[in-house]
């Protein structure tokens, strides 16, 4: 029971949400009541996947979201399933979260030595530097000496796309790589291409010894196998909501990955408030959809609803202890209340998907909503905060 539910959690958005209906030329069958897609919506994407498997082209899929995506658990089974069927084009996006002290997926590692990094997050878009593709931006002094180690043991790579601002110098690599610098910028950023003749699982990036650049600002990298197939990128920021990503400058950055499919997996942070207003959420969702359709007109969109969650509140009282009852022991009790807002957000997402003629997967309902979530708790598959989920 425990293992089957863990598998369901990991596979719901990925395999059940997409693969079960990706090749349906007609309406989605009633056997998948939690999934909506217009007739033939994924037909062109299905064809692109078949071509990639046969001719060595690449299909790019991006899953954008919050902490559930930053941890990598949700996207991993989707990547594994699609790459097993259509070819492994590489690990895809590598978030440099560790360089600012945050968590990251466990199938890659990014380290750094030298002068510390300063970061700005998309949670506060009024920052001093242009926001990067990963929902963060990292900077250090141009004169700083630093190295960055990138390791991807499960996905050997022959090529790396490195994202930096146009005013920052390219990084060099060891083992030595052929460097092709980006010529055209998307917003403030350009993409350099590092290529190796043999596949590697670990490389070191180094800043120039004599650096006369105006700044040293980097946003992350993409790892490619050098073969055709599928790239599945996971981009997430802890605490992110639709309102944080619904910015023209940010959506423009997504075009660097040339996604044929964009999976938007948010909603938990949008509705995790006792002051939640559905109208505010709808405005943010509509703004995001408008920007994606305008800036990425050829990209298919799949919305996923947030999983069930709980509000929690701590209460403190004191218990008199000791033989003479002169000592007081502090006792903290945690109480939980189901987050009804998640149900409202899920209903709104499914409704808006149908209105816009895009796809949506109701993860909230697939997990049983309020009535079904107790079994997840009983099996220990919810974290102590009853918002996040264990693996």
Where does each model-flagged region fall?
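Alpha-helical scaffolding within the catalytic cores
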Residues: 37-51, 243-256, 286-291, 312, ...
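Bacterial N-terminal signal peptides
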Residues: 10-21
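Short glycine- and acidic-rich boundary segments immediately preceding or forming the N-terminal edge
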Residues: 20-48
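Short hydrophobic beta-strand that contains or immediately precedes a catalytic carboxylate
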Residues: 61-65
């Amino acid at each position: 029971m425990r293992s089957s539910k863990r598998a369901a959690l990991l596979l719901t958005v990925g395999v059940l949400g997409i693969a079960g209906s990706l090749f349906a030329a007609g309406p989605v069958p009633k056997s998948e009541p939690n999934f909506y897609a217009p007739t033939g919506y994924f037909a062109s994407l299905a064809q692109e996947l078949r071509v990639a498997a046969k001719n060595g082209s690449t299909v790019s899929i991006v899953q954008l979201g919050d902490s559930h995506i930053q941890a990598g658990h949700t996207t991993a089974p989707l990547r594994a399933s699609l790459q097993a069927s259509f070819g492994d084009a590489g690990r895809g996006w590598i978030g440099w979260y560790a360089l600012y002290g945050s968590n990251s997926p466990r199938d890659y590692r990014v380290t750094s030595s030298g002068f510390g990094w300063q970061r700005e997050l998309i949670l506060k878009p009024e920052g001093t530097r242009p926001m990067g593709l990963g929902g963060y931006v990292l900077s250090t002094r141009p004169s700083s000496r630093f190295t960055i180690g990138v390791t991807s043991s499960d996905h050997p790579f022959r090529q790396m796309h490195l994202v930096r601002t146009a005013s920052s110098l390219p990084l060099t690599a060891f083992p030595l790589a052929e460097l092709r610098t980006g010529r055209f910028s998307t917003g403030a950023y350009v993409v350099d291409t590092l290529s190796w003749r043999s596949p590697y699982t670990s490389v070191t990036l180094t800043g120039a010894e004599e650096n006369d650049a105006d700044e040293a600002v980097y946003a992350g990298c993409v790892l490619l196998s050098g073969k055709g197939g599928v790239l599945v990128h996971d981009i997430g920021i802890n605490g992110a909501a639709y309102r944080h990503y619904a910015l023209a400058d940010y959506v423009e950055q997504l075009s660097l990955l040339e996604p044929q499919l964009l999976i938007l997996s948010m909603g938990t942070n949008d509705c995790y408030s006792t002051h939640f207003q559905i109208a505010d959420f709808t405005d943010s969702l509509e703004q995001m959809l408008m920007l994606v359709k305008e800036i990425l007109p050829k990209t298919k969109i799949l919305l996923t609803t947030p999983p069930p969650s709980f509000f929690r509140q701590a209460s403190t009282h004191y218990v008199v202890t000791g033989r003479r009852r002169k000592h007081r022991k502090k006792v903290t009790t945690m109480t939980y209340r189901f987050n009804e807002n998640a149900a409202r957000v899920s209903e709104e997402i499914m409704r808006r998907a149908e209105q816009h003629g895009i796809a949506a997967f109701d993860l909230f309902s697939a997990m049983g909503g309020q009535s079904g979530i107790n079994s997840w708790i009983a099996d220990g598959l919810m974290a102590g905060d009853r918002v996040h989920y264990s693996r």
